[in-house]
Regions:
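Cleavable N-terminal signal peptides
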Residues: 5-6, 16
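Targeting-peptide/extracellular-domain and disordered-appendage signature
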Residues: 19-87, 92-175
């Protein structure tokens, strides 16, 4: 059987989708803070009208902010996170949302993992508590740097009407 060119062209989009077109798009964002480069790579899930906090993302459980592979954060120099030291390196980012208290932000040394299951607290390098903020609705999860000053920045995880600001300190240290 010989297929005509139009038949092949019409069949091609289905073949592309069958090979795993991602439901959540990937994003990589880099931000310089003093002499430090912070790079974040993550999948961007879409709310699609679903209730997020306490339902799609359960309260008091470790959650990966993203889709597919775990969110990776790379610091090319030592930094502080909410005032706590974190060595230069590559980490996966995890959050524990709480309904009535600050959320827990986790940096894990298990940087190259899928988003489930959580690699476990034995892989945690740093845990800090951060108070979430109400924000305008963000349909697609976003990790952004809304504040960048000379030696500090805020990395914000924003999805739905909740944003989690994570303060990064990057002291100016010329080599």
């Amino acid at each position: 059987m010989q297929l005509s060119f139009p038949a092949i062209v019409l069949a091609a989009p289905g073949a592309v989708c069958a090979q795993g077109y991602p439901f959540s798009q990937r994003q990589t964002i880099s931000q310089n803070v003093a002499l430090t480069t912070v790079t974040v790579s993550y999948g961007r899930p879409v709310a699609r009208g679903r209730p997020l906090w306490g339902q799609l993302v359960p309260w008091d459980s470790v959650w990966h902010p993203g889709a597919d592979s775990a969110t990776r954060v790379v610091f090319d120099h030592d930094v502080t996170i909410e005032g706590h030291a974190l060595k230069a390196g590559e980490y996966s980012l995890w959050l524990v949302p709480h309904e009535q208290r600050p959320w827990t932000v986790i940096f894990s040394r298990a940087a190259h993992v899928f988003h489930k299951p959580y690699p476990g607290s034995s892989e945690d390098v740093l845990r800090v508590d951060v108070s979430p903020e109400s924000a305008s609705h963000m349909e697609t999860l976003a990790i952004e740097f809304p504040v960048v000053l000379r030696e500090q920045a805020v990395m914000r995880v924003h999805w739905g009407s909740t944003a989690v600001p994570i303060h990064i300190g990057a002291p100016y240290r010329p080599d």
